[in-house]
Amino acid sequence: MKADIHPNYEVVAVTCSCGNKFETRSTLGSVLAIDVCNLCHPFYTGKQKVLDTGGRVQKFADRFGMFGTKK
């Protein structure tokens, strides 16, 4: 490997928009601002909404299902 071509891998202070702060390692710099983290993301907090696509799929099949059948 060539010497002195890789970026520095430093400790970075990460701040979320919800106010959560933690440290990790990165080559991006010393401060990193993010929009969502594990404390405010809906998937991790249990507030994720499941969309009901069954009605839409059935509506599509009712309208266009006849085109897939052979006579």
Swiss-Prot record:
A GO cellular-component term linked to this record: ribonucleoprotein complex
Co-factor: note: Binds 1 zinc ion per subunit.
Keyword Cell wall biogenesis/degradation: no
Record: residues binding Zn(2+): C16, C18, C37, C40
SUPFAM superfamilies noted in UniProt: L28p-like (SSF143800)
GO-annotated biological processes: translation
Keyword terms: Metal-binding, Ribonucleoprotein, Ribosomal protein, RNA-binding, rRNA-binding, Zinc
Function text: Binds the 23S rRNA.
Family: Belongs to the bacterial ribosomal protein bL31 family. Type A subfamily.
UniProt subunit comment: Part of the 50S ribosomal subunit.
Name of protein: Large ribosomal subunit protein bL31
Lineage, uppermost ranks: Bacteria, Pseudomonadati, Pseudomonadota, Gammaproteobacteria, Pseudomonadales
